[in-house]
Amino acid sequence: MEQFYYYWSMWFLWVLTTFIFEKTKRRIAVSVFILTNIILSIHDIALYFSLNAAYLMFFVCGCVYAGYLGMYRFRYIMVYLTLVAAYAFVYLFALYDPVWFIIKPEWAAVILIVLLTASVERNFEKQLVLFVLGMCQGELVYSFVIQKLAGAMAVGGFQWLNACSAGMILLFGISKYEHLASQIGQKSKRSNKGATKMS
């Protein structure tokens, strides 16, 4: 079942946003985005490439949200281009010499991009935008390069959707872990201050 990881990951994210997060307008927007993305995942749009509609939704919403967050500075553009190059490199290297890969190339690309994103950006929303845009544009670059060898191919199919949704959950987990670690660190500092005052 090719779309297994995508559907389970998106349903997991939908349950988180709908039942666990605080009731805000942003929560409603994210829930609607997830459900719409799941619905669109079975449709393809024929342009220069055959584009999956859910992939296109990720790309367009990522660009819009990047503009909303003001991510048009040189630093973000360089990080974004690095992520695109990393994604395309992993896939092209896997075609050239697949022996080096212990795991599937899509998972290697996701792990690499998640690590790069988490190491250069601390804000979770900006991490998410950088990750999604890097994955989207990287897939487009890879498809453009490989079409000369393999002919026309679908961009953003379920293989890509699986990897992208799993990467978003991984980023969410890293964000929550960092938040928890900072809270524990603050509590330990307070308890140490209290102990020194008592002594």
Curated annotation (Swiss-Prot):
Localization per record: Cell membrane
Membrane-topology descriptor: Multi-pass membrane protein
Cellular component per GO, a single term: plasma membrane
Keywords recorded for this protein, A-Z: Cell membrane, Membrane, Transmembrane, Transmembrane helix
Cited InterPro entries: YphA_Bacsu (IPR014617)
Pfam families associated with the record: YphA
Transmembrane annotation, as ranges: 1-21, 28-48, 51-71, 83-103, 127-147, 154-174
Protein name: Uncharacterized protein YphA
Organism of this sequence: Bacillus subtilis (strain 168)
